Amino acid sequence: MPRARPREETSATWSLLPLQNPMAVAMHRNIAQVPLTSEPVMELGLDVSFEDVAIHFSQEEWVLLDKAQRLLYCSVMLENLALVASLGSCTGMGDEDVTCEPAEEVVCNTSPSPQETHLLEIPVPALEEAWHQNEFLSTQPVQTLDLSRTGSGLKEDSNRHWKSYSGEKSCERDSHRATAMSSCRSHGLTEPFIRGKDGEEALSSIAGVQQQGACHSEQPSTGCLQQQATCIREQPYSSAKCGQALLNGEKHCKDGECQKGSSCKHTLVQCPSASSEKRPSECSKYEKAFSCSYKHAQHQDSHSGKRTHEHSQHEKPFSKKCRLNTQDRICPQERPYKCTECGKAFIYKSELVYHQRHHSARVHYECVECRKSFTYKSNLTEHQRIHTGERPYQCEQCGKSFRQNSSLFRHHRIHTGERPYECSECGKSFRQIFNLIRHRRVHTGEMPHQCADCGKAFSCKAELSQHERIHSGEKPYECSECGKYFRQFSNLIRHRRVHTGDRPYKCSECEKSFSRKFILVQHQRVHTGERPYKCGECGTSFTRKSDLIQHQRIHTGTRPYECEECGKSFRQCSSLIQHRRVHTGEKPYECIECGKAFSQSASLIQHQRLHTGERPYECSECGKSFSQSASLIQHQRSHSGEKPFECSDCSKPFTHKSDLIQHRRVHTGERPYECHDCEKSFSRRSNLVRHQRVHT
């Protein structure tokens, strides 16, 4: 039975407790405090029970204690309980050598759990129950002990003491338990928060003490029984409604109505007094309501793509603070969960289970529109936005919207200029990590994606997909203006500029604009004089790589472009296109001055100089100017005496290639120019013109 208190205790009395030590607390309650060593008790042969050293509080008194007083109270009670347990297990009768029954040791649950963190908030009757439960102690074998030097009667009294709690005082414990449960429910707690896992009491997680009994073993090296408990895990959030706090008293997440706190934002418990149907916060974009304002704020962040919480070490952003806290607890280098199929490692077990669906090839979710199947529901949700056209994530800067939140987050880096992914080899940075991975293959030379038809390898899968359309002939992108199809979407975008006349790339030197960026880069080399592409055979340099490739065909003799009509082959694709117009008679380039048409744009440009009188090519020797660069080159040979064209039959050299062609007709007898009036033929066109004057 609890001891009768000799005097009335008030709240003012309890406010002085933080200034007193455990001994003073016990003296204040007129309860004898047993020293924290068992030797004096052994020598005096006292009959000690746990009730002799216990301190009892009512619920009204317990509420008045602050967190330091509660922790001190629990620590002292654990010490006393450990001491009484060691005394009860190490005493015997008389001078006989007996073997003690297996003692029970205080075992602490070191695994973190929500139940442990709520321990200091439960009322004192529930703590009293926790001390007297048999499940609180786990059995540990003890060595055979020599108890001849100990007093008699302690074991019997101790056994009677524990029996009284398990038998005679069962009704009292039941009433304590009922009171504790009702009090806990009023605080928003239920029984699982009081009892630990597998029946162990939550009290086992309180910061405890290590006690050694003064028992003597037959073997000198055998240690005595030890009891210890571990420190309680601090939780930064608590319930302010009940007037209780935990160790540090911080409350990061609060419900607006009941001011109840939580250790994580997404686990904030709603006040039981609040109506479950009341949802004061509503999204203005979607008709979705939230019971807590912080959830509404998180939902709105998902539309804007904000990630307000950033890890201090890894500079990784998070949209929720609880995910940031998880990142603090586990370093990304620690990935304990490894896939047995592909060897990929993960930080969390749930991620491993999520990943293993790829290997199982199970299809769970199917689109009702196109019957496409997906392994994960989130992928199906994102896919369905293609059919609905929904783009819920909008950029606040430019108004561009996206189907996925991650796409909006990456898009924000265009406005901020952030490039978080840097190459360790060359220092080049990128906005997206897959661009960095693809760039690294430039240094390593890795080409993991290979074409099954021609064996050509590529550094990224997108390039392989585009290349495979060459074999399949697929051109999925169609121009809405002219109906022309393209293999790549980027080619369609560039083609549209033909219709719109858009030239977004402008030269800063001469104000000339271009429809494509790489053409601007090539043009700027005219101003800088840069010629980065050099021929390994003759040392000739070029401003464009395509010019170098075409030039190298002169050395190799390669003519990959062949005409289907006459079989003539060419080194350049543009030359083949121009040649085909000879067969079709197409002349798309027309002079606006005289209406004369040409098959090549270069011929039109040269012709227009006749109307303008422009002669941009001037000889540096004599100052004579020409309208065509070829004419200037031919003229300069008259000063140098160079005759590069030689006849293979008679070895006669010529200054111009046209002169060589006409000369060879002397050896072949060819006369391609024929008069329509008398059917007379000539080897030169000039001779035909002179002959036709006879008929006129």
Curated annotation (Swiss-Prot):
Q: Give one GO biological process term.
A: regulation of DNA-templated transcription
- Tell me which UniProt keywords the record has, alphabetically: Isopeptide bond, Metal-binding, Nucleus, Repeat, Ubl conjugation, Zinc, Zinc-finger
Cellular location(s): Nucleus
Offer a single GO CC term for the protein: nucleus
Q: Check the record and name the Pfam families matching this protein.
A: KRAB (PF01352), zf-C2H2 (PF00096)
| Keyword set includes Metal-binding | yes
GO terms for molecular function, please?
Answer: zinc ion binding
Q: Is the keyword Repeat assigned to this protein?
A: yes
Q: Where is this cross-link: Glycyl lysine isopeptide (Lys-Gly) (interchain with G-Cter in SUMO2)?
A: 349
| KRAB domain segment(s) | 48-119
InterPro entries on file: KRAB, KRAB_dom_sf, Znf_C2H2_sf, Znf_C2H2_type
Task: Cite the residue ranges of zinc fingers (C2H2-type).
Answer: 337-359, 365-387, 393-415, 421-443, 449-471, 477-499, 505-527, 533-555, 561-583, 589-611, 617-639, 645-667, 673-695
Main location class: nucleus
Q: Where is this region: Disordered?
A: 300-319
Q: What does this protein do?
A: May be involved in transcriptional regulation.
Q: What family is it from?
A: Belongs to the krueppel C2H2-type zinc-finger protein family.
Quote the protein name from its UniProt record: Zinc finger protein 551
Q: Which organism is it from?
A: Mus musculus (Mouse)
Q: Supply the source organism's classification.
A: Eukaryota, Metazoa, Chordata, Craniata, Vertebrata
Q: Which gene encodes it?
A: Znf551
